[in-house]
A protein has these predicted regions:
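Glycan-processing catalytic domains of CAZymes
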Residues: 1-199
Length: 199
């Protein structure tokens, strides 16, 4: 196999139905769409529970996903895999909580920005910051955390200002500083710079 040339031992994870094709591979969860059908909550909950309970001692990665609404048919690629509704954010919350209750050491968020399959949690006009706010609220509940909901919007503000002032070297340097502050979790200082140029 391809991994035989690697110096360090690796653990491979596949979709559950492909798991038996690679000896010793673990599985990861994914929205269980198939046959172009609309997948109900009962179906995807059953899928996740079986994955988390019946892994036969093999490692597995739990999965949290917001929905599945692919564009394959509309794009003329092939038939749609199916549809799994967001239920106004409830699907993500339930899959995340179910993943937390599993014995998995890792939770995969499926996905950050897969617009082709409609599984994105990245902020959009349709969903706003719903998914990031949920994750932030969960984290804050369990950890000391100085951030708030408005901090989630600072990267897009930085991006918009970079576009607006792309030919202004002086302001661009200040925006570079704001970027470094954001990377360093110093959101108040970064926000002050961004507000200064948001007129």
């Amino acid at each position: 196999p391809i991994v035989s040339v690697l110096k360090n031992k690796v653990q491979l994870f596949t979709l559950p139905h492909l798991n038996n094709q690679i000896q010793g591979a673990g599985s990861f969860g994914w929205p269980p769409v198939h046959g172009g059908q609309k997948i109900t909550k009962d179906v995807w909950m059953d899928y996740l529970q079986k994955l988390y309970m019946n892994h036969n001692g093999k490692p597995f990665i739990a999965s949290a996903f917001p929905q599945f609404h692919d564009i394959y048919h509309q794009a003329g690629i092939h038939k749609s895999y199916g549809y799994l509704d967001s239920s106004e954010g409830n699907t993500f919350e339930v899959t995340f909580q179910t993943a937390l209750k599993s014995s998995s050491e890792i939770i995969q968020v499926a996905t950050w920005n897969d617009y082709g399959e409609g599984t994105m949690i990245e902020p959009t006009k349709e969903f706003g910051y719903r998914y990031l706010e949920f994750l932030q609220a969960y984290y804050i509940k369990n950890h000391e955390h100085p951030f708030n909901k408005k901090d989630l919007q600072l990267p897009i503000k930085l991006y918009q200002l970079r576009k607006k002032y792309q030919n202004n070297k002086s302001i661009s340097r200040e925006l570079d500083q704001a970027s470094l502050l954001l990377y360093d979790s110093r959101t108040k200082e970064a926000r002050d710079i961004l507000i200064k140029h948001s007129h």
